[in-house]
Amino acid sequence: MGIIYAIISGISMSLQGVFNTKLGEKIGLWETNVIVQLTGLILTLVISFFWGKGSYSNIKNANKLFLLGGALGVVIIFTVMKSIGGMGTTFGIGIILIAQLLAAGIIDAFGLFGTEKIKFCLHEFLGIAIMIVGIIIFKWKH
């Protein structure tokens, strides 16, 4: 099931990046960020109300660093819009994917933020290198 969720996430993130960039051209970058965060909040509140199984009272037991997810969302929306607006969808998302994979590799390799430490070996580095070469080939001018 994890693969299905990852595919849905990847498609959704690409669509969101394009939609946000296009909306930003009409109403402004920060205004779009507000709309995105607000609609996300409303939808999440409805879903949480009907199907939520957690407890907001447990937030006092959470690592306070992990509360920065919303602030990171603002950074993500801003930077995705600027990258897609400046480089186009495919190139922008390609660079984003490489950066995500590198960051995830570092998090795994060092077991950061309480995650399980997962070895990052030669074949992982080769995979990232192949992605980088792929982006270079993709943008190569004829």
Regions found by a protein language model. Name each.
Residues 1-8, 25, 30, 41-66, ...:
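Membrane-interface interhelical linkers
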Residues 8-15, 19, 64-87, 137:
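Hydrophobic alpha-helical transmembrane segments of multi-pass membrane transport proteins
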Residues 13-16, 100, 104, 134-135:
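Alpha-helical transmembrane segments of multi-pass membrane proteins
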Residues 25-29, 79-98, 114:
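Structural motif at transmembrane-helix junctions in multi-pass transporters
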Residues 35-36, 68, 95-96, 123-126:
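Hydrophobic core positions of alpha-helical segments in small-molecule transporters
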Residues 39-43, 95-110, 129:
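Alpha-helical transmembrane segments of compact multi-pass small-molecule transporters, enriched
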Residues 120-139:
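Hydrophobic transmembrane alpha-helices of multi-pass small-molecule transport proteins
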